[in-house]
Amino acid sequence: MEKLKKYVLSTRFLFIAVLALSVVVFLLMLFPDTGSLLGPNIFIFWILLAFSGMGLAIITYKERISGKLKFFLLSSGFSSGGFLLGVVLHNAFYALGTLTEDLAILHAFLNFLEGTFFLIAVIACPIGLLVGLVGTLILWIKDGKRA
């Protein structure tokens, strides 16, 4: 049991989980006609991706990984966790913006925050995730060839 716990809480396992869940989420968003995974059911995969990303970031710090590998693993972890956070905050600020249409300054500020978190969720996090995944894979492949 202790061996299984060490394997599940390793950077390699969590990185593979982030990679697999990223592919699943990307395919589900690219092809939305997947039956029962339409609508709110995709949140299951988004939550799993966010938790595995946060776990990857935590384990990267705990294992005291350094150098370029640390940068790429943290980029993967934070970007996969930040995606769900950006989506939720974008929708929350949109809802608050519709409630405060009469208050011009507050409405404009909430619309600014809505757009900011939309750009974070749709542009910044996927780019960071892609950079982290590809960079980690390249470093691990180079490390495997040296050994």
What are these regions (language model features)?
Residues 1-55:
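N-terminal signal-anchor transmembrane alpha-helix
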Residues 2-8, 35-38, 60-72, 145:
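Membrane-interface helix-boundary motifs at transmembrane edges
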Residues 10-18, 104-142:
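Alpha-helical membrane-associated segments of multi-pass integral membrane proteins
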Residues 21-25, 51-55, 83-87, 124-135:
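Alpha-helical transmembrane segments
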Residues 26-34, 57, 61, 87-95, ...:
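Transmembrane helix-loop junctions and nearby membrane-interface residues
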Residues 33-44, 85-122:
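Interfacial non-cytosolic loop connecting adjacent transmembrane helices
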Residues 45-75:
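Canonical alpha-helical transmembrane segments
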Residues 72-91:
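Hydrophobic alpha-helical membrane-insertion segments
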